[in-house]
């Protein structure tokens, strides 16, 4: 049995965390040989809810769950953390401009980044789930200058999984059969779910689906799936977001040779400028994401990728005083 790992979850009394924490406690992030200790961070008014969640976690008697700590203090929450899921965020208010939403969330993620910088373990990995996730991750990263930038990710895995699900439904194939799907860009309506390189059972996906369906139905449906779920369910995606967060962190830590979509800091690959965090085609090796290199980019792809870059640069400009 390995030494325990400390995992911090923010917004611990919320709906996403309610699904996420059981998966973590069951050993699905670090594996069946690694115990976990949970730090649950909440705002003071929600500590009672977090306490109730902790009681239920204890009642589940997970063999790998060695400790639960509940706090509203940032420094305590991130002390010694090996992994952090930044789930808690301020939702968009009615009529609120996106710039105001970005600024209000920056006031949450900036201090969290500083606390991570000052108190987390050296091997800390941070996954931002709370939206607008890409720029929230940029803000947290910018406030943690002593932590390698590669340790800050935003979640595109939900979009990746949604894309595969739509393709499986369309083609009648199993989700597990699809490879080399990628979602480029921002976790927003501008995102670009890309099937250019995708295969299923050795066949090119682009040969199995109509191009008009791909452009006019598939891409917008994946991008707007969250809104579709809210309309049908009356609540935002929670269990699927939690499941995708586990997928991302597990693959980041344990590795994967198959492609995954991960929002990571740009290092200039595919002509994308540095200074933004965006979804890219990646594999995970030795605990680090590596961008899949050597892909040919056509004009259609370039236009979609560039639109995401422009959007993310605009978001960065809106929060430049927080970076």
Swiss-Prot record:
The keyword Flavoprotein does not apply. GO terms for molecular function: L-malate dehydrogenase (NAD+) activity. Catalyzes the reversible oxidation of malate to oxaloacetate. Gene3D superfamilies: Lactate dehydrogenase/glycoside hydrolase, family 4, C-terminal, NAD(P)-binding Rossmann-like Domain. This is Malate dehydrogenase. It holds the Pfam family Ldh_1_C. Keywords: NAD, Oxidoreductase, Tricarboxylic acid cycle. The lineage of its organism: Bacteria, Bacillati, Actinomycetota, Actinomycetes, Mycobacteriales. NAD(+) binds at residues 11-17, 105, 112, 129-131. NCBIfam families: MalateDH-SF1, PRK05442.1. It comes from Corynebacterium efficiens (strain DSM 44549 / YS-314 / AJ 12310 / JCM 11189 / NBRC 100395). It catalyses: (S)-malate + NAD(+) = oxaloacetate + NADH + H(+). Substrate binds at residues 92, 98, 131, 162.
